[in-house]
Amino acid sequence: MSQSRTLRQKSQKYQENIEKRGVASPKKKEDGLNINPYVLGFIIFVVVGSTLLQILKGQ
């Protein structure tokens, strides 16, 4: 019994996939900070605001 052409192609594709298992492609390292400017502004607002409140309460 001979295999049909499509069956051979599927088998070959499967074999190539087997050899690639477990190999992760290296990810590009992104430079810079990945944070929304609004979120960064909110964090700075909270930190600076809480610092000012603590200074004013201490006096």
Swiss-Prot record:
GO terms for cellular component: endoplasmic reticulum; endoplasmic reticulum membrane. Keywords: Endoplasmic reticulum, Membrane, Protein transport, Translocation, Transmembrane, Transmembrane helix, Transport. One of its GO terms (biological process) is endoplasmic reticulum unfolded protein response. Residues 56-59 are extracellular. Residues 1-34 are cytoplasmic. It is found in: Membrane; Endoplasmic reticulum membrane. It is a single-pass type IV membrane protein; Single-pass membrane protein. Residues 16-30 have a biased composition (Basic and acidic residues). Coiled coil: none annotated. Residues 1-30 are annotated as: Disordered. It comes from the Eukaryota. Disulfide bonds: none annotated. The chain crosses the membrane at residues 35-55. May interact with target proteins during translocation into the lumen of the endoplasmic reticulum. May protect unfolded target proteins against degradation and facilitate correct glycosylation. PANTHER family: GEO09675P1 (PTHR15601:SF0), STRESS ASSOCIATED ENDOPLASMIC RETICULUM PROTEIN SERP1/RAMP4 (PTHR15601). Belongs to the RAMP4 family. This is Probable stress-associated endoplasmic reticulum protein.
